[in-house]
Design a protein with these regions (language model features):
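Active-site-adjacent structural elements in enzyme catalytic domains
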Residues: 1-39, 47-60, 170-173
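Solvent-exposed loop and edge beta-strand segments that line ligand/cofactor-binding
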Residues: 15-28, 70-86, 123-140, 192-193, ...
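Secondary-structure capping and boundary motifs in well-ordered enzyme cores
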Residues: 23-26, 81-88, 106, 110-117, ...
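Active-site lining segments of carbohydrate-active enzymes
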Residues: 32-136, 147-150, 222, 236-253
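Carbohydrate-active enzyme catalytic cores, enriched for enzymes
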Residues: 99, 140-307, 360, 364-368, ...
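Long, repeat-rich segments with strong aromatic
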Residues: 111, 118-119, 124-156, 264-271, ...
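CBM-like, beta-strand-rich accessory domains located in the C-terminal region of large
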Residues: 218, 224, 319-491
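Catalytic Cys-His active-site segments of thiol-dependent hydrolases/isopeptidases
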Residues: 308-313
Length: 491
C-alpha cells in the first residue's frame, strides 16, 4: 500500500514540465526526494516508472547543472558561500548517484564539481562550527550536508575531505551548547526561536565524529517531537540513522566563545541553583547573507524563561529586503534594524551594515569571566569607538558595560532591549515579570539615567505584525565618552 502510494507520487512529480529551475533550491529538493524514493523503492517500481525517474533526474536536474558549473560566476547557486551551495550541490550528487549506472561519466563529472565547490560555503564554519546564516539555515545546511557525507561515504568510500574541513566536526556541538535551558535557540539572523529542529543531523554527526553526547541530546528532542507530532520532513531518517550511544553530560563552562563570522558568546550559571543566568550574545557582519543589524545583541534566561527576545525574520518578499548596502532598504524594516535588538543606537541611527563586531578581549578562566566586543566600525561616522563588555559576577548576575566615544557631547546613546515580559520601570531599575517569575535590570551608571518602556511597533503595514513585545530603553547624553553599566540579575 505504501509503496504503491510512493510510486504514484514519483510518477506525478516526474511528469511536471520542470522542477522550477529559476529557483534552483526547488530543483535540488525535488531531486533529493526523487533520488531517495528511486533508491529505496527500486525493487518494487515498475520498469516504466524507473525509466521515467531516470529520465527526469537527468533532464530536469543534471543536464542543467553541467552548464552552471561551466559558466556560473561566484554568485551562482553552485559556487556561492551560502546554504544554497550545500543544498543544491547535495541534491545534484544524490541525483547523480541514483542514476550513475545509466550515466556514469555524467555522474562522475557532477560529483567532482560538487565536492570542488561545496567548501566555498563550509569554509565559514571555521574555526568552531558556527553557521553565520543563523540557526534556521544551520539546520538547512547541515541536514543536506549529512545527506551528502552519508551518500558519498556509503557509495564511494570517501567524502573527498569535506568532513575534515575545520569546524565541520564542531558544528553540532556548537548548536547543542547554544541551545538555551528553556530549549529555545539563539535565533539571530532570519530565524525563529522554536526548539532545535528534529532532524537526524545529530545522529549522523554523533556517529561520524564519535560524539555520543550529541546522540543523547537528539534522543531527548525526538521524544518531545513524537509527543507533539510536529515532525520535520527528514524525520524518517532518524530510524535508520538512530544512535543509542550515551555519555555523561559535561560540566558547562561559565564562559564559552565560539568564533566565526558571528562570534557566539555563551555564559552559564550553575543550573543547579535557582535564578542562575544563561546569556548568549553575538558579534557579526551584517552585510553577509540573512544578517540583521544586531551586533552586540544578547538573549538572557533564568528559570527557563527568556527575558530578552529576538523578533526573528520578516517577509522575504518585502521591497528591497535583500539590499544589504549601508543605505539599503533592508534596514528600514524594524525586525532587521538595531532598534529591534538588544543593543545600542547612537542618535537613534542605524548601525552600519558595512561594519563588523569582533572579540577584543576575553578571560574565561577568571573568577568573574568576561568578554569585550569591539563594535566601533558598526557605528562608523557616529562615534570614535564603541566597546561592549559582558562580565559574569556570579551565577545570578551579569554586568553589561558599554563604553562609547562620541564625536561630540551633544550626541545621545540609546541602550535598549526587547522583551515579551511585563515591564515595570522605576527610575534606574526595571523589573520584568513573566510566568510568576521576575528579572531585574539596574542602571549602575550614569547615575542620573533612567528606564522607559514603550510598545514595539513595526515600521510599515507591509511588515509582519508585532504583538506583546515591549522595548525597554535608556538614553544618555552630555559627555564625550559615555560609560553605561547595566546590572542584569535573576535574584
Amino acid at each position: 500500500r505504501f509503496a504503491e502510494k510512493a510510486e504514484r507520487e514519483l510518477i506525478h512529480v516526474c511528469n511536471f514540465s520542470d522542477w522550477d529551475p529559476v529557483h534552483y533550491l526547488d530543483v535540488a529538493e525535488m531531486t533529493t526526494a526523487v533520488a531517495i524514493g528511486y533508491d529505496w523503492l527500486y525493487d518494487v517500481l515498475a520498469p516504466s516508472t524507473r525509466q521515467l525517474v531516470v529520465h527526469s533526474i537527468k533532464t530536469k536536474a543534471l543536464d542543467l547543472v553541467v552548464e552552471e558549473y561551466k559558466t556560473g560566476n561566484a554568485d551562482s547557486w553552485a559556487k556561492r558561500e551560502t546554504n544554497w551551495n550545500v543544498v543544491c550541490n547535495t541534491g545534484m550528487v544524490l541525483g547523480a548517484l541514483a542514476i550513475e549506472e545509466h550515466y556514469p561519466e555524467l555522474a562522475k563529472h557532477i560529483i567532482g564539481e560538487a565536492v570542488r565547490y561545496i567548501p566555498n560555503c563550509l569554509k565559514h564554519f571555521a574555526p568552531d562550527g558556527v553557521c553565520y546564516e543563523g540557526p534556521a539555515y544551520w539546520g538547512y545546511t547541515n541536514m543536506y550536508l549529512s545527506l551528502l557525507l552519508k551518500a558519498l561515504n556509503d557509495n564511494l568510500g570517501e567524502d573527498f575531505g569535506i568532513s575534515e574541513m575545520v569546524g565541520v566536526d564542531k558544528s553540532v556541538l556548537y548548536y547543542m551548547h547554544s541551545t538555551s535551558p528553556s530549549g529555545k535557540i539563539f535565533n539571530f539572523a532570519n530565524s525563529g526561536s522554536t526548539a532545535p529542529a528534529a532532524e537526524p543531523i545529530y545522529f549522523y554527526f554523533s556517529r561520524a565524529f564519535n560524539q555520543p553526547e550529541v546522540a543523547a541530546f537528539y534522543r531527548d528532542i525526538l521524544s518531545k517531537t513524537v509527543q507533539s507530532g510536529n515532525y520535520f520532513r527528514f524525520y524518517f531518517l532518524s530510524i535508520p540513522w538512530y544512535d543509542t550511544a550515551s555519555s555523561p553530560a559535561d560540566a558547562l563552562p561559565k564562559l564559552k566563545v565560539y568564533e566565526g563570522i558571528n562570534d557566539i558568546i555563551v555564559f552559564n550559571g550553575n543550573r543547579n541553583i535557582p535564578n542562575s543566568l544563561y546569556l548568549i550574545a553575538k558579534t557579526g557582519d551584517p552585510d553577509m547573507a540573512h544578517q540583521q543589524l544586531d551586533i552586540g545583541t544578547f538573549i538572557i534566561e533564568t528559570n527557563g524563561i527568556r527575558w530578552t527576545d529576538d523578533l526573528g525574520s520578516d517577509n522575504y518578499g518585502l521591497p528591497g529586503f535583500w539590499d544589504y548596502k549601508p543605505d539599503g532598504q533592508r534596514w528600514t524594516y524594524f525586525r532587521n534594524s538595531n532598534f529591534s535588538h538588544n543593543t545600542l543606537s547612537i542618535d537613534h541611527r542605524l548601525q552600519n551594515s558595512a561594519g563588523t563586531g569582533e572579540i577584543d578581549r576575553l578571560d574565561n578562566k577568571a573568577a568573574q569571566p568576561f568578554v569585550t566586543m569591539d563594535m566601533s566600525t558598526t557605528y562608523a561616522g557616529q562615534s570614535r569607538f564603541v566597546y561592549r563588555t559582558f562580565r559574569m559576577l556570579d551565577d545570578v548576575r551579569i554586568l553589561v558595560t558599554d563604553s562609547i566615544g562620541l564625536q561630540n557631547p551633544s550626541q545621545s546613546v540609546q541602550w535598549s532591549v526587547i522583551t515579551s515580559a511585563n515591564v515595570e520601570c522605576k527610575g534606574n531599575t526595571a523589573v520584568l515579570k513573566k510566568d510568576g517569575k521576575s528579572f531585574s535590570l539596574k542602571i549602575v551608571s550614569p547615575v542620573d539615567a533612567f528606564f522607559t518602556a514603550r510598545a514595539a511597533k513595526r515600521g510599515t503595514e507591509a511588515e509582519k505584525p508585532i504583538e506583546g513585545y515591549t522595548i525597554l530603553s535608556a538614553s544618555v547624553s552630555g559627555e564625550p565618552v559615555q560609560v553605561i553599566k547595566v546590572l542584569l540579575s535573576g535574584e
